């Protein structure tokens, strides 16, 4: 998921938690 930068597996890898 994209809840955290290190566990991200989507194209949102560089977006902050608020930008999900």
UniProtKB/Swiss-Prot annotation:
Signal peptide: none annotated. Conversion of fibrinogen to fibrin is triggered by thrombin, which cleaves fibrinopeptides A and B from alpha and beta chains, and thus exposes the N-terminal polymerization sites responsible for the formation of the soft clot. GO terms for cellular component: extracellular region. GO terms for biological process: adaptive immune response; blood coagulation; innate immune response. It is found in: Secreted. Its main location: secreted. It comes from the Eukaryota. The keyword Amino-acid biosynthesis does not apply. Keywords: Adaptive immunity, Blood coagulation, Coiled coil, Disulfide bond, Hemostasis, Immunity, Innate immunity, Secreted, Sulfation. The modification Sulfotyrosine is found at residue 5. Cleaved by the protease thrombin to yield monomers which, together with fibrinogen alpha (FGA) and fibrinogen gamma (FGG), polymerize to form an insoluble fibrin matrix. Fibrin has a major function in hemostasis as one of the primary components of blood clots. In addition, functions during the early stages of wound repair to stabilize the lesion and guide cell migration during re-epithelialization. Was originally thought to be essential for platelet aggregation, based on in vitro studies using anticoagulated blood. A long coiled coil structure formed by 3 polypeptide chains connects the central nodule to the C-terminal domains (distal nodules). The long C-terminal ends of the alpha chains fold back, contributing a fourth strand to the coiled coil structure. Heterohexamer; disulfide linked. Contains 2 sets of 3 non-identical chains (alpha, beta and gamma). The 2 heterotrimers are in head to head conformation with the N-termini in a small central domain. This is Fibrinogen beta chain. It comes from Ovis aries (Sheep). The gene is FGB.
